[in-house]
Regions:
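Non-catalytic interaction/Regulatory regions outside core domains
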Residues: 1-124
Length: 124
């Protein structure tokens, strides 16, 4: 098993733990090309976008994280970024140097509290 496959296995477990949280709808690890390599939707959750739109959203999330890293030298690294929408809260966490943990949560969540919980569960 490669080191990368080992990381994916670890993140599969972490995503499953995150999905046990009531407020989390989706937890997935995206590779640098925006491919979902582990995780997914909580059982019983209906995706709000079709597969093509989700793939586009995944690629855009990775690109946004990468773009923010251009400012790490001056401002320090981004721990997470979040956007509150009417239907969901989306959160991204840079992990494994060039991967992204993408979280979709219920729209009523306290973003900072949820982010701290995610970082605690994932230990980063």
């Amino acid at each position: 098993m490669s080191e990368q496959e080992s990381h994916y296995g670890i993140f599969t477990k972490k995503c499953n733990l995150l999905l046990e949280e009531n407020e989390i709808r989706f937890a997935g690890l995206l590779d640098p090309m925006g491919n979902l390599v582990s995780g997914g939707f909580k059982k019983g959750i209906e995706p709000l976008k079709d597969e093509v739109e989700r793939k586009k959203m995944f690629m855009e999330a990775v690109l946004r994280v990468k773009t923010r890293q251009d400012f790490d030298d001056n401002l320090g690294p981004v721990r997470y970024a979040a956007s509150r929408r009417d239907a969901v809260v989306m959160m991204t966490f840079p992990v494994l140097h060039d991967h992204v943990l993408l979280i979709s949560a219920e729209p009523h969540v306290d973003i900072d509290k949820t982010a701290k919980k995610i970082m605690s569960i994932c230990k980063f």
